[in-house]
Amino acid sequence: SGSCEVKTCWWSQPDFRVVGDYLKDKYDSASEMIVEKHRESRGWVETLTPKYTSFKAPTERDLIYYDSSPNFCNPNPATGSFGTRHRKCNITSHGIDGCELLCCGRGHDTRTEKRREKCHCIF
């Protein structure tokens, strides 16, 4: 007769919001890189170097990119993008639905509507 001890360890994922905020911070501080090809004894080798040397070199945990994002403001039939012209925007928002970002600096039109509706009020 012996004793048995059970020990269980596990990792749990943080809340989805925490992960999203972390990734957004990484995205916002991603470093643009230049792909340089050069020949070595083992063949062609590609190396990544920072495009802007005034910035700190990225670490293993930083996000990097070497292709700039397309301009989503203007229509692009090749990618199927319709652009953002004539889209509805939220004038009070500073997020992705806000007029400042969504209208790409082109300005925006404001439309005021008057509606007459039955409210089914009981007095």
Swiss-Prot record:
It holds the Pfam family wnt. Glycans are attached at N90. Disulfide bonds have critical and distinct roles in secretion and activity. Loss of each conserved cysteine results in high molecular weight oxidized Wnt oligomers, which are formed through inter-Wnt disulfide bonding. Its main location: secreted. Belongs to the Wnt family. This is Protein Wnt-3a. It is found in: Secreted, Extracellular space, Extracellular matrix; Secreted. It comes from Alopias vulpinus (Common thresher shark). The keyword Amino-acid biosynthesis does not apply. Keywords: Developmental protein, Disulfide bond, Extracellular matrix, Glycoprotein, Lipoprotein, Secreted, Wnt signaling pathway. Ligand for members of the frizzled family of seven transmembrane receptors. Functions in the canonical Wnt signaling pathway that results in activation of transcription factors of the TCF/LEF family. Required for normal embryonic mesoderm development and formation of caudal somites. Required for normal morphogenesis of the developing neural tube. Disulfide bonds join C89-C104. GO terms for biological process: canonical Wnt signaling pathway; cell fate commitment; neuron differentiation. A lipid is attached at S1 (O-palmitoleoyl serine). The keyword Transmembrane helix does not apply. It comes from the Eukaryota. GO terms for molecular function: cytokine activity; frizzled binding. GO terms for cellular component: extracellular space. Signal peptide: none annotated. PANTHER family: PROTEIN WNT-3A, WNT RELATED.
